[in-house]
Amino acid sequence: MIKLNHVSFSYQNGEANEMQVLSDVSFQASRGECVVLCGKSGCGKTTMLRLVNGLIPHFYTGKLEGNVLVGGQEMQQTPLSQTSRIVGSVFQNPRTQFFHLDTTGEMAFNLENQNVPRPQMKKRLEEVSYRLNLQELMDRNIFELSGGEKQQIACGSVYAALPSVIVMDEPSSNLDMESIRKLQKLIRMMKDEGRTVLISEHRLWYLEGIADRYVLLEDGRIRQKFTPEAAADLSLEKRKALGLRAVKREQLYELRPDMGLIKQKSTGLEIDGLQFSRQMRQVLNVPHLEIPSGAIVAVIGENGAGKSTFSLCLAGLLKHTGTVRIDGKKIAHKKLPEQVYLVMQEAGHQLFSDTVLGELTLNNPALSEEKGKEVLTTLGLNGMENRHPGSLSGGQQQRLSLGTALCMKRKLMLYDEPTSGQDGENLLRTAELIRAANKQAASTLIVTHDPELILRCATHILHIHAGEVKKFIPLDARGVIYMKKVFGEDAQTKKPQKTGIPRLLEFTGRHRPLLGAAQLLSGISALFLLGPFVCVYFAARALLTGLTGGGF
């Protein structure tokens, strides 16, 4: 279904010496197969997806060698209008693929472009919303959805169009555990229906029992291929060396929290009567909350619970009621941006400079070029000083925003999904950066669904549910148990053993042409088997007609 033959590609960015992103890559994926592209940030995973969905070379220009075939069609020669009927795409940032203001319109957009009749379109949307459990998200304003809810709508929109191939770029990056379970169900469903699924991903554990192969890229080349069994057997040290994160669910909890981080017992952040409403509806209510000085608090909860809204209120970006005290001093709402720094979920929204180095010095004119390069080395961005921030991968942009936060030295540090798009190596680097920045701050809050990050740097858990604080506890042994409960650790996520009709559906999805031929042969065989009975029937009819003189 997908075939890349000796493909090399470099983006056209106006520089004399363009960096080769992919070098002599050969790859193929069959019908009904789920293949996972993994590797460090910037290794070429997203570029491979762009080759498959036709965005390269029709949208992203550059030097392309080799050929890319999808469903027997050469992508270089196939217009995007035709490619979109074959390949569906879920991008790393779902906002970049939205064209409507409401969720129902967005779900129907692909079907409208394919001229699907309205009655059939309505029936298809009802079916998709039911199968993917999206009923509560229909007829909603897209701008009021959380990042995870937007990702669910993007997945539903693609699935509704029934493409033969689906490419997904970090589909789990902003999802809570319940939404990840829905994503697992969706991927299994697409496999069972015979669709080819190609996923670029750092969070690998949820694909256990789903992925058929893991392809590891390094510096634009395919370094290694793993079977599911071989990937699951990789040790922690080997995964670190390859830049991979947990491959199995139980590997998420290999580490234990470090309770030696807090040196003080004074209050770093105090909140009283914080409330926020949207369209006459209260979405956040925090009557009272005290966070110790030096604490690194993991803010957890389901998508849409109010976690990001909470961080935006503390950063002074949303007008709210109530008081906020940092180190015992009451901070007026308009003064919050001077005391608080927020690394947003979509890092590209905070990058304004023409160069990577310029991004660090934009709000820090006193920062020397030498010091700025040292920070970039700490971020793993050395050698990229003069690149445009927009040319970085999603994970690299995230780390650049973290570096900017480190240079700002604010009293309260807020991070919204800081490990979105981060590989195993940079997950560790992110945890170290957060701990380093926390040494200069009163407190730190991290909005995250990532237990790997939490166990590497957090000291407390703050559980927000339906806009209210449900629990605030230290991340000790009891805290880990509570976190696992919130994350639905007891829920069944492994692939169930298929029997009966589901097993038959999976087989028919993968071997549809073979079964079609078998059906044809069965039909012909049935005709031959019926032949003698037909002859007996007509002979008996003739005999009876003769005996009755033609009256039968």
Predicted ranges, named:
Residues 67-82, 323-337:
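ABC ATPase NBD Q-loop/coupling interface
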Residues 119-137, 369-384:
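Conserved ABC ATPase "signature" region
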Residues 141-145, 149, 388-392, 396:
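Conserved ABC ATPase signature
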Residues 166-169, 413-416:
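Catalytic Walker B motif of ABC-type/P-loop ATPase nucleotide-binding domains
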Residues 201-202, 448-449:
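H-loop/switch region of ABC-family ATPase nucleotide-binding domains
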Residues 221-244, 468-494:
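Conserved beta-strand-loop-alpha-helix hinge in the C-terminal portion
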Residues 489-529, 549:
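Membrane-integrated ABC transporters
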